[in-house]
Amino acid sequence: MMRRKSNLVTRTLNRKLPLLAALTVIVSAGFSISLPAQTTPYFRDKDFNTWLKTDNPVSLGITTMPNAGQTSLNAKTLSGDFHKAMESGRVNAWGFDSYGSKSLKPLNLWGRFNFSQERHQDRCWSDNIRPYNGNPYLTGSSVKGNYSYQLFDFSVRMSSKQLFDFMWIGIGLDYSLGDFSRLQDPRSRTQEIVYTIKPGVAFRFGKEKIGLNLSYGYSKEKIGSYVSKSKDSKEYLLYLQEGLGVYSILVSNAYDRRIESWKAGAALQYEHSFGSNSVLLGELSPFYRKDSVEDAYGATPGNYKEAGGRFFLAFRSGNWRSESFFSFKTGSAEKITQKSVTVTDPSSGVTSTRYETIFSIKSYTAEKLSAETGLSYVVKDTALPWGSKWNAGCKVWFNSDNDEYVYYSPVSSFARDNIVPYFYGGGTVLATKGHFLMIDGEFAYRVNLSDNYSISDELRDKVILDNVISPDREIMTSDFLKVSATFRYVFPLPATSSGRRLSGFTSLSASMCFVPGLNGSGRNLIGVSVGILH
């Protein structure tokens, strides 16, 4: 059995946790977990501060946030067989979540700190934490197993208040550490570190505002695999994917892979005010990403590059909200062939191995286009600090994907188009003596518009095609209905020793997915949370 290397996450936390804790106290944000299905901010800030929908951290300075926060304990369970081949069959999770905003004399601050602990069941084919992020270079076993996933996630935003009566400056920082470990042979361990920094500025010229922010991000995913109990490790194989069913096989014995990713971007914002309660805001944000894949001893099977952009437009007039966005990205992977070279240092006699590239060629391309437009009506009552009086809206989302493995002739390709109409609404149904009951719901139906699928005759071995690509195609092109609802109850707590009154809350969220074309298929999510509003 191979002794594990020291835990990157633990060592990094020991160095960074004091700083994270200090910043968290400053912005009134404690411990937390991110549970997407039930993260319902008690202030609907984005409905009334349109700049919060942009990527610019000066959004905190343009409109001052309330001195408030939320701390909660959350749990969720996700189950059902309507999921992609490299996703987990079942996920049980719990954690803490705390975030808050604070207005100081020169600055407006916002911060969030999350911790989550997840148990994944029946997962196979990929030990990558996010196997569907575009990069085709994936690693995994065909043997289903259970995984443990820990995530520490920290975010902070700082913005000046208005300077010289015409400008704001701000900065944002995101930092996370993840540990994704398989609990059975072949035992893989994936460790990830991600950080992003976003400086921003905005200027006011009468009824116009112009903003600009830059973004730089770095991440590193390190995957290791070994066999601990079997005497014959050759019975465990790793499948190293290259895109659309192409793969190679490696015995799972002391395997290592590192994927480093760099992402740079910018965002330009423009706002025009038509009056005290009518605003038009647009944002254009291009980006570029590069992934470098490296195996043991510096061998490189390939790399992945991606570029794209997003245009966002929001209009607010009174209680009406209209939002639209259009985004696109194109990615390509290179297949690299190398040879090993053994070098001996003449003075020390030490022998080392390095890899030299013989040739490289484009092997895989991916194109993605998404668009959405929607209209909503939101009624806010200042007597209801924990939500809107009521809201209703609809939107339509369109998505088009086209993946090709161009190393083969003819090429392998998979293209699909989907459209999803949404209808949602909710509000406060009870508000009396500090007690509030809020209900929100959503109804969505995905319709597949087209499905073009072609596999090259050059693909001889079809293990990944039959077990990953074809099942994923069925999931990605199936029509389905999704219904979700959230119930949230807020109640007063006894006054503190300083006389300050806080509120507690509890919430229940549920989401159900029904697939008419696949008998018995579905995906269900149930989540609960209990916490304090402060």
List each language-model region with its residue ranges.
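Outer-envelope beta-barrel architecture signal
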Residues: N67-T71, K105-G111, D165-I169, G206-I210, ...
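Outer-membrane beta-barrel transmembrane strands
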Residues: E87-W94, N146-L163, W168, T190-Q191, ...
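Outer-membrane beta-barrel "beta-signal"
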Residues: G522-H534
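Transmembrane beta-strands of outer-membrane beta-barrel pores
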Residues: A75-D81, F115-R119, Q162, Y175-D179, ...
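Surface-exposed extracellular loop regions of Gram-negative outer-membrane beta-barrel proteins
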Residues: S159-L183, V194-K198, V279-A296, K389-N399
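Residue-level signature of outer-membrane beta-barrel architecture
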Residues: K102-L104, S160-Q162, V201-F205, Y270-F274, ...
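Extracellular/periplasm-exposed beta-strand and loop segments of Gram-negative cell-envelope proteins
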Residues: H83-G89, Q121-I129, L138-S148, Q184-T190, ...
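N-terminal, post-signal peptide beta-strand-biased segments of exported outer-membrane/organellar beta-barrel
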Residues: S34-R123, N135
